[in-house]
UniProtKB/Swiss-Prot annotation:
It is an enzyme of class 1 (oxidoreductase). The gene is hemA. GO terms for molecular function: glutamyl-tRNA reductase activity; NADP binding. During catalysis, the active site Cys acts as a nucleophile attacking the alpha-carbonyl group of tRNA-bound glutamate with the formation of a thioester intermediate between enzyme and glutamate, and the concomitant release of tRNA(Glu). The thioester intermediate is finally reduced by direct hydride transfer from NADPH, to form the product GSA. This is Glutamyl-tRNA reductase. NADP(+) binds at residues 179-184. Possesses an unusual extended V-shaped dimeric structure with each monomer consisting of three distinct domains arranged along a curved 'spinal' alpha-helix. The N-terminal catalytic domain specifically recognizes the glutamate moiety of the substrate. The second domain is the NADPH-binding domain, and the third C-terminal domain is responsible for dimerization. The active site is at 46 (nucleophile).
Amino acid sequence: MIGVIGVKRNVDIAIREKLALYPKKHKKYVGELLNSFKEVVILNTCNRTEIYFNCTEEISEDEIFDKIFNVFNWNDDLKKYMFLSKEKRAVTHLMEVICGFHSRILGEDQILGQIKGAYKTAISDNSISSELQKMFEIAIACGKKFKTECKMFEVPVSSVSISINSALLKGCRKFMVLGYGEIGKLAIKHLLSHKVECIYLIVRDKSKASDLEGEIVEVLDFNEKNQVINEIDCIVSCTAAPHTVVRNEDIKTEGETIHIYDLAVPRDVDKELSEKERVILKDIDEISKIDDKNKKIRKERMEEYKHIVEESIDEFLNWLKIREVSSKIRNIKIRENEICSERIKTFSNKGNGENAKLAERMIKSTADAYVNRAIELLKSEALKGSDSYCAEIIEKIFLT
């Protein structure tokens, strides 16, 4: 059984923080999950916590919740904020997620790269090998096709772009970006495409961003951030830290207005800062509510190309159906080769060498013609969901 358990949409950020996973514990999580499930993929982003699994045994929903909650040491009171989807619903969920239909900012395509990353990590961890691997391969192809054909780059959107565009409209020109992961890199790229006065990039390891040093960008470590934090107009924070990185005491009470966009989950910024008159603080939930002119265009365009999602769902479900009869097909081919070998051997003992070779080709081609037709019929019936009776007849003909 294929399934996914994750945080429900529109759950408050205060709850999502309690369900966030820490990357440093990833190996431990996977190892423990594989004690209960055949395959596992963990999708852990700033806005999404989902565990995709495949189990061979029949297992109740309560058992699934218990096993996963025990691994992550989540409080049972948080179960009401989680969803569980199985079989086709789980497949549909992944295909829609990778195309941006479930993103807090509709159409945001960062999720495609994040799912590709989760898939590659699962391959590296040896935590997928069959059904989940195929499902993610089809999903990634679906996401790429959707992105290309839908041409969402013509109406670009992300939490980063919305935050920075909002700040620029408010007159911000001096920026600080905390963190240089995927989101931080997007923030820097977006800022460099606009006329800003300066950018302070705050990182743990300055060597990882040394190529950015220039007239506009100055790279500092976290110990140096407070030297300039009260001089800037806007902070974009997007670290993976499990703790607060911008504290209430870091920003003075008096001074010019400072806009803070906290894109992290758990939150990077002390929420008490919003009580200071000079601070305008927005977390990821508030950022996703900022209306932008492209929202309606994105929604209409995505609906127009939703057939790509539906085709990918069908592709995977059809693969599963064919896979269910693959062992029967394999046995038929084995039996075909056995019968052909017996007939060829019998003829070879009676005929001359030249005739034997001709007979071998004729026997093999005749057998292939009938066996391949039977296999085509079995596959066709499997796709219709009516393969059991067909398989019974074919087995009686070829395997008894």
